[in-house]
Amino acid sequence: MAKPALWATTAGLNSPRRDPVTPPPAAVPAEARAIGGWRRLALWPFALLLKLWGRSLRFVTTPEDLRAFTKHDEPVAIVLWHNRLFLSAEIVRRYRQGRPAYALVSASQDGAWLSAFFSLAGMRTVRGSSSRLGREAATALVGVLRAGLDVGITPDGPRGPCYDFKPGALIVARRTGAPLLLVGAEFESAWQLRSWDRFYLPKPFSRVIMRCTHVPASALDQREAAAVTIAGRLRAINPDVRKSGGGPPL
């Protein structure tokens, strides 16, 4: 599965703001593949299905976590495990006021399909990955944060191992001084794919218990130590990480 590691919603960089902010367009590397024509059109029914699927889910959270999710006075780096990415669009829509969202996807052919899908689902994309075109991708993410937008990071993407927190995931937040919002999700009923991350597909209309932890920028000064601490906190709010599996794979 290609890596969607970023989504962005408007939030004030130095002061609270409620009006949408349009970030400067990130340059798409020349090597990035694209999908167009009938192939793009063929994705539309699938994108609509997944949007309706996501909206059917029943998110449950505590008042404290809800306040952290919906705090908009500064941009944050939202961190969640790769196998929770199905929830990303709904997190933006429900908790980040549904503002325009950005997804970082690979510059490969697989990423081209994912980029086209995200576009049809109402999300915009930045192309790049940790393995190819990484410098351009990092620069684009920094630009998004400095424009006053949130970014999302999957610290075990794009190829795993599953739940292996890579210290490099903190680079963008450290360069901009943005705090982290660690996201946890516990599924009442879900399928899991036979992918490297055992990707979760919550069953329609099922309940998802959402958790989050706010980490201030000051806690990121020492990258290696911060990565160990943050990885532990992210595992703590995702209970299945401590289990051998979360359900029968598809």
Q: What kind of feature is each model-predicted range?
A:
Residues L66-T70, S115, A169-L170:
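Short amphipathic alpha-helical segments and helix-helix/interface helices
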Residues T62-E64, S106, G128-S131, T213-V215, ...:
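Conserved beta-strand termini and adjacent loop/short-helix elements that scaffold enzyme active sites
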Residues K51-P75, R84-S88, R93:
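A short, well-structured juxtamembrane/interface segment
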Residues E74-R132, Q192:
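Catalytic core of membrane glycerolipid acyltransferases/transacylases, capturing the structured
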Residues D65-R67, R84, Q109, R159, ...:
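Residues that cap or initiate secondary-structure elements
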Residues R18-D19, G36-R39, V60-T62, L85-S88, ...:
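Short hydrophobic/aromatic-rich motifs at helix boundaries and adjacent loops
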Residues R58-E64, P100-A103, M210:
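Generic preference for hydrophobic/aromatic residues in regular secondary structure cores
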Residues A2-R55, G98, L120, R124, ...:
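Non-catalytic C-terminal accessory region of glycerolipid acyltransferases
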